[in-house]
Amino acid sequence: MSHHSSWRGHHCAPGDINCTAGFKESLGSRNYKLLHVPVHGPTHSHHHDPPHPFPTVDVPDHAHYIIGSVILIVGITGVIGNALVVYVFCRSRTLRTAGNMFIVNLAVADFLMSVTQSPVFFAASLHRRWVFGERPCELYAFCGALFGICSMMTLTAIAADRCLAITQPLALVSRVSRRKAGAVLVVVWLYSLGWSLPPFFGWSAYVPEGLQTSCSWDYMTFTPSVRAYTILLFVFVFFIPLGIIGSCYFAIFQTIRAAGKEIRELDCGETHKVYERMQNEWKMAKVALVVIVLFIISWSPYSVVALTATAGYSHFLTPYMNSVPAVIAKASAIHNPIIYAITHPKYRVAIARYIPVLRPILRVKEKDLRSSFSSGSVSSRRPTLTSQCSLGVSMGNAARANGRWGKTRLSSASDSDSCWTESEADGSSVSSLTFGRRVSTEISTDTVILSSGSSVSNASGQKSERAHKVISVPVPSITFETDAADGESLSDGKALLGGN
């Protein structure tokens, strides 16, 4: 039932102190009431909204409706897109890997962000105010903080995973498993929860913001407690993770550049293949980098607004300046599925395979689908880490050829079991280890690799005058218990021999 009210009364003569009678007429669709209320002085006909526990802002109605429509589109896209990411990455055997667990977790956080934020924001925008009460406001803001922080921490974990995959490939093989990736994700959620709960216990608060149709933590109140929470929140969930991400990608770039230079000097066919695999890993790292950059761009306007208010300049902020950045930040939930649908070939093929109705949109070729099906049908015992080209240096040439590419890889060549995964540590796949080739790649024309570095032999196998002992290093060809068709979760750069 719609209601409105208006003031009606007698015009009082100037100076007539006995004129205190007035009437408030409450108009409904079926009834009329006349309520006697005291008035002082002359009255005029004007409208009053009914009292409400939450404040409102004086903006045109269409502003609420436009923002509500945008957030509804963002929510629908985020729910559908991230649900597809979770479904496809969990369904496809080639994508069900330890490294991709971080991508799935990011999609879960974005999915929950879309589910909990967009419908409520849209409904409040239709009413042009927050209508759900104090506790729902706190819960709404808590969910936004929790899932937003979790997304940022997950992106940090993805950057670290890509960094290890390229700069420390064999270390990643031996150390990263699904169980350990799951443990990292548990830490991510607990860390996010730790920064989302304090407003419930009096450190800052969750309150309506902007156009008063959504809620967030209180960054507008200029008190020491509120300012301390806001500053620490940005330091530990935005700036420090941002620094870690930047450091990881700087290390990735440096490794790729150095590896390319050293491989050109070695001029070995197998090392060129290794470099190509590393380049493939770099392509995946670039996809993750695009997701990270877009996430940071989405949250940067909101960060600027919050930090501006924290610095004591909240009087410069308008309701629009608070609400629009909040909408942009919530839109970060749709970047992940869109980017992977455009740039991740295996993801596109998997969607086309499991959701045929989307094939025309994705434009996946039939031969790619057949190739994906055949690769997914082969035995899961497929080699993903094979090193048949090893590097070596003589003691006399060490000064010239013991750069990072040669020296660090050689350091682990004598300890071949450092390349094994946990699935092989129990000896269940010993038969899959094939010690086939000996060291064959030459850096100089008359040297082969030494595990101890104590002697050398020439290319024909004869001992040189300097040699006291020749040690040949068998190089294992290792087959992993994995579902990945090309070892994508392990970094194609892991075909390197060694790599601490």
Curated annotation (Swiss-Prot):
Q: Does the keyword Electron transport apply?
A: no
Q: How does it sit in the membrane?
A: Multi-pass membrane protein
What gene is behind this protein? opn4l
Q: What is this protein called?
A: Melanopsin-like
InterPro entries with a match to the protein in the record: GPCR_opsins, GPCR_Rhodpsn, GPCR_Rhodpsn_7TM, Opsin, Retinal_BS
A Pfam family found in this protein is 7tm_1
Region (Disordered): which ranges? 404-428
Instruction: Give the record's glycosylation annotations as residue positions.
Output: 18
Q: Function, please?
A: Photoreceptor implicated in non-image-forming responses to light.
Q: Which SMART domains match?
A: 7TM_GPCR_Srsx (SM01381)
Does the keyword section mention DNA damage? no
Family, according to the entry, reads as follows:
Belongs to the G-protein coupled receptor 1 family. Opsin subfamily.
Indicate, by first and last residue, each region the UniProt record lists as having compositional bias (Polar residues).
409-428
Q: Which residues lie on this side of the membrane: Cytoplasmic?
A: 87-101, 160-182, 254-286, 344-500
Tell me the keywords, alphabetical order: Cell membrane, Chromophore, Disulfide bond, G-protein coupled receptor, Glycoprotein, Membrane, Photoreceptor protein, Receptor, Retinal protein, Sensory transduction, Transducer, Transmembrane, Transmembrane helix
Location comes to: Cell membrane
